[in-house]
Amino acid sequence: MRFAPNRLLTSVALAVVMAGGVTTVTTATASATPRVNVCGSSYTYLESFPIRSGTGTTVGDIDLYWSAQSERNCAVARPVNGLTPHWIAVEISTPSGGYASDGLSENYTQYAGPVSVYAPGCVSVFGSMGYGGPYGYGQGDANNVAC
């Protein structure tokens, strides 16, 4: 299981509770989960696609990378805004049938992936994560990107 506790978020929440009178904390005040290239040194970051909850709140990102050396795209799904999901999954595919996934039967809480496919053309990516409370389930995708 991949897990990194967010002590800053815990400290902020504790401070708010101790201050009294404030009953809600928005995710916008929490620090973003950093994007880290776990695909490898030959991969270059291309772009990110949001993973949103049913209420439209962005709860994660799917980061897409490219390696010109191997002609492969790589995807990683990660939470944002200091949130910690119960699970994370990521998938990547090509129009020609290339496919890879990670986290579908796991309980990752920091990130899912890296997953990569040989893709001299376009790829599609899908990411999802499960939360308790108000966020429930989040998903996001991007079709025919990095062409």
What are these regions (language model features)?
Residues 31-147:
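Post-signal peptide N-terminal regions of Sec-secreted extracellular proteins
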Residues 1-44:
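N-terminal prepro-regions of secreted/extracellular proteins
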